[in-house]
Amino acid sequence: MKNLILVLVSATIALLLGVWVTAYLTVWPPATSSVGPGIAVYDREIGLVPRPSAHTRRIYPAIADRSAFDFDVYTDDRGARVDGPGQRSAARYDLMTVGDSFTWGYALANKDSYAAKLGRELGASVTNLAMASYGTTQSQQLLERNLDLKPRLVVYGVIAHHFERNVWSCAPSYYAFCLDVSHVAWNGDGKPYIAPPFSNGVRRQQVHRAGDYRSPVRWLTHGADVIFGRLYLAWTRNREPGDTKKAEAMQFVLQRMNRIVAASGARLLVVFLPTNYYGPPAALPGIIEKVGNGIRFLDLTPAFERNKKEGGPNPYIVGDGHPSLAGHALIAGGIAKYVRREGML
């Protein structure tokens, strides 16, 4: 009996120690903090969507080559970024932007994002429904939900990393565990489809960030959830499809996006936003051509390279691949020029 008790006690201690090490000790806190309810809420179809009618301040400490900064994220009742609190969506907009943090306006006030600048340059009303960590898949889904706003033009800001994000079941995040999102998968017949998120990664992140696991039961259940999230992230990354499948996924989602945009009477402009001056993946222009049906493509890599050659202001945040204030101005100017030339509004 004593031996059995000793075994049970030892096993319990080992289990608790394993949870502590795997779910807490080795999960490093992100080099950022937030004041407010957070920018995202869980969504069963997409995984995460912008938190509507909210205000969150994001705070980033100084690092070796970058000063500390913070920025405010205000959203309207649909989750679109806006300039201040209490704003509601209009019944319709001339222009809608979708994409990831490059379009959302990471590190900037909404008024300084290329979406807001583009609206001012074109004299058009604009709603920015981009979201940090999104790929093409989630952008298409959120776009579809909001096409009742009847935009005349939809601008999708694509980056090279969306090829990976489209097939990842865990979105990029600050934590070493899964932030579950929708993603392209393939059925038994080899046909692509959009699979829903597997679990609630938003709750997992929010509980961990807030430290809301002080009770013994909460500590154990959240710890188990984090361990699952770490294992699931590792498992999915090890099963990542190759480049051919990633290109197939991109074409599949862009076709869906263009089809719903065209059916609504709008036009779709896909804009490639270079990260650290790198141009688009080789497959992207061919994918756009295959999608056809009026889709337009603008590669802004030459504009960024020209700005660099001419000694213009740094279009990137120092120590980061995201566009700076100058970068967003460059993007807005390039898109506005193209839209005017092609008569897209």
Where are these regions (language model features)?
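Serine-dependent acyl-ester chemistry module
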Residues: 159-295, 300-313
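Conserved SGNH/GDSL esterase-like catalytic core that processes O-acyl groups on lipids
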Residues: 104-186
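Membrane/wall-proximal cationic-aromatic binding patches
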Residues: 27-121, 214, 304-318, 333
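Short, amphipathic alpha-helical "lid/cap" segments that border enzyme active or binding sites
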Residues: 136, 140, 247, 251, ...
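Hydrophobic membrane-insertion alpha-helices, especially the h-region
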Residues: 6-22
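Histidine-centered active-site loop/cap adjacent to the catalytic His
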Residues: 4-8, 317-345
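Generic structural signal for small/hydrophobic residues in well-ordered secondary structure
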Residues: 100, 139, 154, 261, ...
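Loop/turn elements at helix/coil->beta-strand transitions in domains of secreted/extracellular proteins
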Residues: 93, 123-125, 149-154, 262-269, ...
